[in-house]
């Protein structure tokens, strides 16, 4: 099946799930609440690239090694949408915490005049939709308990990663010397890699009847891939074109533990370090420009390109060491989607 067919079938599943959620018998909806949920879902869930969600279907298809039945397409898509729902929940709350302005090329949900802090409760609802979907469509499956457990564990890891990110960037305690590659890696591993990379493949493996405890090596490769993905994200936040990436980067203003600042501190001379310490994390454009100037002087674009090439080689080697050709195909498909991406 072509990727276009797959995407249109995937999007149809969203409509089905949304319809089930706004008619969930566990709550007495009226027109107002139904309309609110529908608008909130349409605004926050399907707007991204859908890579995480579609990856469940792709991965399952590669594991199966043949055409999928309508039921398999529906179930793998439903799991994919659970990840997109989880992602929407993280992003809605993340944008409030970061005081962001845009997301996916439109104003953040909480920035809409009628929404504001209602967005906090919407985030909780998005999170609660996941077990509703799992219960409705997977309760009779032998892997149901493992699925619920997987989503709970990954959510815990992601929230804990977000916590390290937030407490490392505490306002009033801006101390760049706390930042290092190892802290960056910990934040990335927990905040991004588990839910964006491991979760889609783990869902496909469970649906295929596999035991996740036997696939620790797959998890390790995917966490490495997630780290590489986040370094790309950090790079694009500063060097990407806002009209391409869909948002205006604010990592410098937000005092983020970005790969760029960690690398810059590693390579800078004393004078450049002083500029970084004095200007990183300040909102005014002049300070941001000074930080970017140091990045350019240190030629961080070339440093990143070197990192990208090395990471790619290492990942390919790890993938090709895996005994299963089907699993190799899943991992290579993932890597192919993100290698040298521009957004």
From Swiss-Prot:
Artemisinin and derivatives (e.g. artesunate), are antimalarial drugs due to their endoperoxidase properties; they also display multiple pharmacological actions against inflammation,viral infections, and cell and tumor proliferation. Artesunate may be a promising treatment for COVID-19 mediated by the severe acute respiratory syndrome coronavirus 2 (2019-nCoV) (SARS-CoV-2) because of its anti-inflammatory activity, NF-kappaB (nuclear factor kappa B)-coronavirus effect and chloroquine-like endocytosis inhibition mechanism. The keyword Ligase does not apply. Induction: Strongly induced by gibberellic acid (GA(3)) leading to an increased artemisinin yield. It holds the Pfam family polyprenyl_synt. Expressed both in apical and sub-apical cells of glandular secretory trichomes. Dimethylallyl diphosphate binds at residues 103, 191-192, 230, 247, 256. It catalyses: isopentenyl diphosphate + dimethylallyl diphosphate = (2E)-geranyl diphosphate + diphosphate; isopentenyl diphosphate + (2E)-geranyl diphosphate = (2E,6E)-farnesyl diphosphate + diphosphate. Signal peptide: none annotated. Mg(2+) 2 binds at residues 94, 98. One of its GO terms (biological process) is cholesterol biosynthetic process. One of its GO terms (molecular function) is dimethylallyltranstransferase activity. This is Farnesyl pyrophosphate synthase. The lineage of its organism: Eukaryota, Viridiplantae, Streptophyta, Embryophyta, Tracheophyta.
């Amino acid at each position: 099946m072509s990727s276009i067919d797959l995407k249109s079938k995937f999007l149809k599943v969203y409509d089905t799930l949304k319809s089930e959620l706004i008619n969930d018998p566990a709550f007495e909806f009226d027109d107002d609440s139904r309309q609110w949920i529908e608008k909130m879902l349409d605004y926050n869930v399907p707007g991204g690239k859908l890579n995480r969600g579609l990856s469940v279907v792709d991965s399952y298809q590669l594991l199966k090694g043949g055409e999928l039945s309508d039921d398999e397409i529906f179930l793998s898509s439903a799991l994919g949408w659970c990840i997109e729902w989880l992602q929407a929940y993280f992003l809605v709350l993340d944008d409030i915490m970061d005081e962001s302005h845009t997301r996916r090329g439109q104003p953040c949900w909480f920035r809409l005049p009628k929404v504001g802090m209602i967005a906090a409760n919407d985030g909780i609802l998005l999170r609660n939709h996941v077990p509703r979907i799992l219960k409705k469509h997977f309760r009779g499956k032998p892997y149901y308990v493992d699925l619920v457990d997987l989503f709970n564990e990954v959510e815990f890891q992601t929230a804990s990663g977000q916590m390290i990110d937030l407490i490392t960037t505490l306002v009033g305690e801006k101390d760049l010397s706390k930042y290092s590659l190892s802290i960056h890696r910990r934040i990335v591993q927990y905040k991004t890699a588990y839910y964006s990379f491991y979760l889609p493949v783990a869902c496909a493996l469970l649906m295929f009847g596999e035991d996740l405890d036997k696939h620790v090596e797959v998890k390790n490769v995917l966490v490495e891939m997630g780290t590489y993905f986040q370094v790309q994200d950090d790079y694009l936040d500063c060097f990407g074109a806002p009209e391409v990436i869909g948002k205006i980067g604010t990592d410098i203003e937000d005092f983020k533990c970005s790969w760029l600042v960690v690398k810059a501190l590693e390579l800078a001379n004393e004078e450049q370090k002083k500029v970084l310490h004095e200007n990183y994390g300040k909102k005014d454009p002049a300070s941001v420009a000074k930080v970017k100037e140091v990045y350019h002087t240190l030629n961080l674009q070339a440093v990143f390109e070197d990192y990208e090439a090395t990471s790619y080689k290492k990942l390919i080697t790890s993938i090709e060491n895996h005994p299963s050709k089907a699993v190799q195909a899943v991992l290579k498909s993932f890597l192919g989607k993100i290698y040298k991406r521009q957004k």
